[in-house]
């Protein structure tokens, strides 16, 4: 099994880290820490990266697995977190990768936004 950095590099194609971080609404330092494995990625960051990289559902599962997580494992999530993740999964499954539009929807429905730049 590949680690996060290998999996991320496979999916980022020709994009720079700065571009991916901006599209994922993440600080560049956050992405750098995740890549160096000095900071384990949380689900929020992985979802944001999946959106920014325009991953399919299977590719998103691969990204989660590279971090030792399961995309569909919701046993430790609250009902609100499960509902939020279902909205995100729906966007990915339907190829809707506009993070701003998704964050507006999450905000309007009272959920935490994706990314860590200017989010709650």
Where is each model-derived feature located?
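Key DNA-contact positions within bacterial/archaeal DNA-binding proteins
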Residues: 18, 29-32, 58
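Short, basic-rich loop-to-helix N-cap that marks the start of a DNA-contacting helix
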Residues: 38-52
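A short, Lys/Arg-rich alpha-helix, primarily the initiator
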Residues: 1-18, 96-120
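N-terminal alpha-helical segment
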Residues: 27, 42-45, 80-84
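Short alpha-helical "recognition helix" segments of helix-turn-helix
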Residues: 16-23, 49
